[in-house]
């Protein structure tokens, strides 16, 4: 799972929407271990013949409180990671993961799934639109902050 999480960060860094720092992988590994210890599971892996193809990971409602104020819906989760290996993109793996995620979340009584996506990533916006997601807000930033003044 750490490899997939790092894959998202590395890919997003190509478009300027993530920054790789020396401690990034260590922090991601610790977060991954904590996520895998949660029961019931809130992360799902797609695989073929034992080979991992993709991952979807949401933060459970109690860990999604920081973003629940962005909507008036009831039980809310935050979709933290969605990643499919480059050779499998466009083959329906991501869509299958999201459909599975929605089915599980419906059964668990989740009302809303919120996520951030990399707008500069040419694959991200069309994918989430196809999955039925729509923007609620837009954020802007400048890097480095020193360039502001």
Model-derived features: positions:
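Conserved GNAT-fold acetyl-CoA-binding loop/helix
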Residues: 10-31
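A short helix-loop-beta-strand connector motif used in the catalytic cores of GNAT acetyltransferases and
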Residues: 30-44, 78
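Conserved beta-hairpin
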Residues: 40-56
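Conserved acetyl-CoA binding element of GNAT-fold acetyltransferases
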Residues: 59, 67-86, 141
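Conserved acetyl-CoA-binding loop-helix of GNAT-fold acetyltransferases
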Residues: 81-84, 90-107, 130
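Conserved active-site alpha-helix within GNAT-family acetyltransferase domains
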Residues: 95, 119-137
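Conserved GNAT acetyl-CoA-binding A-motif
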Residues: 105-117
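Conserved beta-strand-loop-alpha-helix junction that forms the acyl-donor binding cleft
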Residues: 114-124, 141-146
């Amino acid at each position: 799972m750490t490899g997939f999480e790092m894959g998202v960060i590395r890919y997003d860094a190509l478009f300027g929407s993530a920054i790789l720092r020396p401690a990034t992988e260590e922090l991601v590994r610790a977060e991954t271990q904590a996520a895998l210890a949660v029961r019931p599971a809130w992360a799902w892996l797609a695989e073929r013949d034992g080979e991992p193809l993709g991952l979807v990971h949401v933060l459970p409602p109690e860990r999604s409180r920081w973003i629940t104020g962005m909507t008036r819906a009831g039980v809310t989760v935050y979709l933290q990671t969605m990643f499919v290996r480059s050779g499998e993109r466009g083959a329906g793996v991501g869509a299958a993961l999201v459909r599975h995620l929605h089915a599980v979340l419906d059964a668990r009584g989740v009302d809303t799934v919120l996520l951030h996506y990399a707008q500069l990533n040419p694959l991200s916006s069309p994918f989430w639109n196809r999955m039925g997601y729509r923007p609620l807000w837009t954020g802007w930033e400048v890097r480095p902050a020193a360039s502001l003044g």
